[in-house]
């Protein structure tokens, strides 16, 4: 696979996702980081996004609820280069009916090389990083070259 670069702007497009048993933890994290997060563009799965917007007043672009396709919508935005970072407080102790969607979401975040936080500690590390406030170049798959090679 060949790679190219993509610029992540200083103003990030951040996806926020949380399983039911982790929503309160994500809401607390958002509240603790409200002054930073409100400077960025937020996206979320349906229930999570609405809860964040109600609790914090920060505008959130909400997708469908995760089990109804919201995880896949966020994944599509990642593949389109429209999401720069994923904060996903997932619940490792409880299975969810849309587990394949969760795996696909994490796979896409990895394929497209965006930062991912899966708990409060990693989310704190990301938001406190000097890179969070800066424009950053990341390596991403060169899809056009990939497609050309596949069509030969």
From Swiss-Prot:
Keywords from the UniProt entry: Lyase
GO cellular component terms listed in the entry, alphabetical order: cytosol
Chain positions recorded as substrate binding sites: 19, 23, 45-48, 65-66, 98
InterPro entries: Methylgl_synth, Methylglyoxal_synth_AS, MGS-like_dom, MGS-like_dom_sf
Enzyme active site: 71 (proton donor/acceptor)
Enzymatic reactions: dihydroxyacetone phosphate = methylglyoxal + phosphate
Domain MGS-like: 6-152
Source organism superkingdom: Bacteria
One function term, GO molecular function aspect: methylglyoxal synthase activity
Short name of one Pfam family: MGS
EC numbers, comma separated: 4.2.3.3
PROSITE patterns in UniProt: METHYLGLYOXAL_SYNTH, MGS
GO biological process per UniProt: methylglyoxal biosynthetic process
Family statement drawn from the similarity comment of this UniProt entry: Belongs to the methylglyoxal synthase family.
Biological role stated in the UniProt entry: Catalyzes the formation of methylglyoxal from dihydroxyacetone phosphate.
NCBIfam families: MGSA (TIGR00160), PRK05234.1 (NF003559)
Protein name as annotated: Methylglyoxal synthase
Origin species: Serratia proteamaculans (strain 568)
């Amino acid at each position: 696979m060949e790679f190219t670069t993509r610029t992540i702007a200083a103003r990030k497009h951040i996806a926020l996702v949380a399983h039911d048993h982790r929503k309160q933890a994500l809401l607390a994290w958002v509240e603790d980081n409200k002054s930073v997060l409100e400077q960025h563009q937020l996206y979320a799965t349906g229930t999570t996004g609405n809860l964040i917007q109600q609790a914090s007043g920060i505008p959130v672009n909400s997708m469908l609820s995760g089990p109804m396709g919201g995880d896949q919508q966020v994944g599509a935005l990642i593949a389109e280069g429209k999401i720069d970072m994923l904060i996903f407080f997932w619940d490792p102790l409880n299975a969810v009916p849309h587990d394949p969607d969760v795996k696909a979401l994490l796979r896409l975040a990895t394929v497209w090389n965006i930062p991912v936080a899966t708990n409060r500690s990693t989310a704190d590390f990301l938001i406190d990083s000097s890179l969070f406030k800066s424009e950053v170049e990341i390596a991403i798959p060169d899809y056009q070259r990939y497609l050309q090679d596949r069509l030969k």
